[in-house]
Amino acid sequence: MDDTGAAPVVIFGGRSQIGGELARRLAAGATMVLAARNADQLADQAAALRAAGAIAVHTREFDADDLAAHGPLVASLVAEHGPIGTAVLAFGILGDQARAETDAAHAVAIVHTDYVAQVSLLTHLAAAMRTAGRGSLVVFSSVAGIRVRRANYVYGSAKAGLDGFASGLADALHGTGVRLLIARPGFVIGRMTEGMTPAPLSVTPERVAAATACALVNGKRVVWIPWALRPMFVALRLLPRFVWRRMPR
């Protein structure tokens, strides 16, 4: 076990833009763990966290789609670094909606990464944190899951499922000492959406990370990014279906 005395912050999806930006905002005085595929290629990300004031930075191999490895990974992190202080689930894929409409395997792959893998990892993390009696979980949902649109219904349905699961898990964790924060960003301008036309109220990974870090510090349960999306989606959920199905992305 580490002898730094700092409860580790673990970023699952340590190569993601939002995960990296959030990690930098949480790094000062913390023991950081970046978990991602090809963990031996995370030197630049690790260096950025050291520059941001991390006490120590570790990397771990992590394949979100390898569900059988989730439990052993969480157990080994706790054994090596002590109870996890904050776990951020920053992995996910957008996929190709057009392809997913005719390629069932691709549709399932999107849902597997964006929903099934998240459920698996959250379940293992929540159990470990319950045992410790403390900890924080950060889940990245999306406004795409608040009311699923025809233009991205595969990705949107996965996010809808994740949002529902995380909301229920947050309620189940009430009173245990474990908190769960759901971040609901709008369209994020970054690598995942490169080449796409930004939607109204688009945000950057930096803005998403800043808002999420602030919400985490303030003990919020849900954060909409930007905040104006919340009243917008209250209205959008009331639109008749024949109007909604004509909505662009």
Swiss-Prot record:
Q: Which Gene3D superfamilies match?
A: NAD(P)-binding Rossmann-like Domain
Any Pfam family the entry gives = adh_short
Molecular function terms, GO-annotated: oxidoreductase activity
Binding site residues for substrate:
S142
Q: What is its EC number?
A: 1.-.-.-
Keyword list (alphabetical) reads: Oxidoreductase
Specify whether rRNA processing is a keyword of the entry. no
Name the UniProt record assigns to this protein = Uncharacterized oxidoreductase MT2133
